Amino acid sequence: MQREFVSGAGLGLRRALLEPFGAGDEVRVDFLEVAPENWSGSGGRRGRQFRELTERLPFLCHGLSLNLGGYAPLDMSLLRAIKGFIEQHDIRAYSEHLSACADDGQLYDLMPLPFSDESVRRVAERVRVVQDVLERPLIVENVSAYARLPGELEEVDFVRAVLEEADCQLLLDVNNVYVNACNFGFDAHAYIAAMPSRRIAYLHMAGHDEQGASLKIDTHGAPVCDPVWELLAHAYACHGERPTLLERDFNLPPLSELYAETDRIRELQRRSGEAQLRSLGYGT
């Protein structure tokens, strides 16, 4: 039976965090997220530490290799392995990127998709297959990009169309919206407002790298910048408070600095909840 979904502020689990999280101290986040490809089959001490954490805290999975946007057949052995991992560790939900990552071999990167009606139909069909195999809803994530492929749709319309055609949920990556808005010149606030609230399962926050004035790279290697924090508040204002996770893959700072960012997420969630109550006539 599928468990209750997560709430509050979460953090992406990286190997360097296993030791501090396993030291017996309280883990000051509400949930954790992992890429199943990086943890499936872990044995020995690392496997035991990971199992202890999955027994203590709610977990989400965020996949890297499913190739939702590709033309090659879906990797059914990978899907079955992911399903087993989800069941073994009582994972609350599974998400994947709206991207391609394989074509007669693994590309080891998340490649952009053409924003076309044909692409919508193909991706939606693959999402439906994944949902049937996993026997649970799939959550898809908007991705960062640095080049556009030919297509008749805008990114925002493509994402909305996939959600409706596939009847799936959205992981709204706020930093990716900001990065793409800067790189391609669209309105990040309008993009976020246009997403269907009922489809949004949770949100991602991260930092990025600036390559000059006109190019931003989604690295997950820096603190979240002020414009992205402002966009998170905007997302809550548009869609209500949602579970929100901080990603940090590189240049890991002391845990206290990561907690400062997850605490900031909680504060924005608290303010959003208070604003919602005021709009309903409660409080002053």
What does each of the following model-derived ranges do?
Residues L255-Q276:
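C-terminal helical cap(s) of enzyme catalytic domains, especially alpha/beta-barrels
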Residues Q131-L215:
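Acidic/histidine-rich catalytic cores of soluble enzymes
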Residues S7-L13, D30-V34, F59-H62, Y94-E96, ...:
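Hydrophobic faces of well-ordered beta-strands that scaffold small-molecule active sites
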Residues L18-E19, P36-R48, N67-S77, A147-E152, ...:
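Acidic-and-aromatic substrate-binding clefts and catalytic sites of carbohydrate-active enzymes
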Residues D75-L170:
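Active-site acidic/histidine proton-transfer and metal-coordination neighborhood
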Residues G43, P73, L110-V120, A181-H239:
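Gly/Pro-rich active-site loop or hairpin
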Residues G22-V27, G44-C61, S77-R92, R128-V133, ...:
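Acidic (Asp/Glu)-rich catalytic clusters
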Residues M1-F21:
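Boundary/entry segment of secreted carbohydrate-active catalytic domains
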